[in-house]
Amino acid sequence: MEKKEETKQPSGSFSEVWDKRGQETDAANDFRKKIEMEITEARPGYAVGEIVVTPWHTNIEGIVHGCVLYSLSDTVGGTAAMTGRDYAVPTVDGTIHYLKAGKNTSKIIARAQEIQNGYAFSVCECKIYDDKETLLASATMTYYHLRKR
């Protein structure tokens, strides 16, 4: 699988480069707020997000729930796919591989890179790490370009 070359990040703070659509989507995203997810960086084709881990995010063994990792990868991947574009990107498909247990970590960080941007679909690879940069999961997410008619 050929990776798309990463674009240079525009200068300025995250809030300066976060486009109007991203701000509106972020303000309306109640689910993201409920699971305490923060998007910390976004530009067309790339995004970073994190969750500060609390007992609410873990199972009885103290391991971050798989659904939390999946939700983080889906949201961060979707942010990468939609930032700078004038259409929504609902998820069509997602595959995640859980590689290590997310245990004894203060936060989880997801980095998503768009690897394909076609007319109708975007595909993003998302890697999720713990606070020590240990790779916990790898996901491939596909999004449909829901254009206005």
Q: What are the residue ranges of the model-derived segments?
A:
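Terminal targeting signals and extreme-terminal segments of soluble enzymes
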Residues: 1-149
